[in-house]
A protein has these predicted regions:
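Surface-exposed aromatic
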Residues: 93-94
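N-terminal presequence-like segments and the immediate start of the first folded domain
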Residues: 2-75, 79-84, 89, 98-147
Length: 147
């Protein structure tokens, strides 16, 4: 006579979760020299490194101009988002590091050139003593959720 015990779906080992895919993206050649990636995509979440006012060879642009440096940083972010088929609407978190909070606050409306005022990402604004190059006034990092 059978004891009534048998394997059921509950008795099996659970299936392992699918492996997460990590894709690394470099916007400019100098990133590898400095030991970082401009972006990392894991599943549908895109993590973009802090972007600064640097041209494609890593040289500072818009020296001394907070609004100009913000636009240059956002242009680099836009290029990275576009390379992944996304735009600023997909940004869900933004962290801004600045060496001069007063100057940043005066120029902060530059953000609205990129974000819809009705759909802003979460944001943190942090003043720091200095960035990697003393000429950089602002560094912007974002996290985006891919469509």
């Amino acid at each position: 006579m059978a004891s009534g015990f048998g394997l059921t779906a509950c008795d099996r080992e659970p299936e392992p979760p699918p492996a997460r895919v990590k894709q690394v993206f470099h916007l400019n050649p100098y990133e590898k020299d400095f030991g970082y990636s401009q972006a990392v995509l894991i599943d549908k979440t895109l993590y973009i490194s802090g972007s600064v006012a640097a041209d494609q060879s890593g040289r500072l642009v818009s020296a001394g101009d907070m609004a100009g440096q913000m636009r240059a940083a956002y242009a680099n972010i836009r290029r990275t988002l576009a390379a992944h088929g996304a735009g600023f609407d997909e940004v869900v978190k933004e962290t801004i590091f600045t060496t001069n909070m007063d100057a940043f606050l005066k120029a902060s409306d530059v953000r609205f050139e990129y974000y819809d005022k009705e759909r802003l990402p979460t944001a943190s604004w942090v003043q720091v003593q200095r960035l990697v190059d003393p000429g950089f006034l602002v560094q912007i990092e974002v996290v985006a959720e891919m469509p």
